[in-house]
Amino acid sequence: MNKKYLPSALILYLNYFIHGVGCSILGQAVIKEALAAAWGVEAMAITAISAALGLGRLIALPFAGPLSDKLGRRISTAIGSASYAIYLIGLALAFNAGTHGGYTIAYVCAIIGGIANSFLDTGIYPAVSEIIYKAPSVATMGIKFFIAIAQMLLPFVLGVAVTSTAAGFTSYNPLFYGCGIAYIVLFVLVFLFPLPDADQKASGKKEGLIDSLKHTHFSFESIAMILIGFTCTGTFQLLSLIHISEPTRPY
């Protein structure tokens, strides 16, 4: 790995560190109860907000990848960071709105959060693989590592981030605002450090999207891996939603 890309790799991984918090927030029982109380809905209704994340991801997937190839990893990552900031800060604003449209605001922001997820995936996965080109599998494992660390630390952070409003509601807005501001900082930083694909474009060595597609070959093993990834992720999300909606049900 070229050492000049080391700060860039750290910035990309930090996006997924905050993502580890963002994608897990709505699955935390205490946050779910706090949001439900503020919006005047049943706790189970928060499941629909979680599902909106998946909806947003599905909406963006068809064009996020081609845009990443055409516009570059930097732009794709920046779109993801900015969208995630909107999602997280939007959740805080939705909490403040309470029963005056708070639930609707949160649903729209969750869709934007899902779109952010798609752009981060299509920007950062190839970017870190291009940076750590001698060991791309290690590069992608690093993404999972940062997500796992964030999810492990989240329960401890919740104890620090909790506050109470004047109306007596439990609030986790400091966490929402903090993560949203972190994404704004990362949005700025991603433009300040070099990325391999941007350098290749500048030197005229970057292969075009059409040329890249011409050399694409899906082996039996690659198709099997795609199917495994889809079914494993889908099963995990399904079980998570069931657990969120029925936390006291024995398994």
Question: What are these regions, as identified by a protein language model?
Answer:
Residues 51-65:
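Central cavity-lining transmembrane alpha-helices of secondary-active solute carriers
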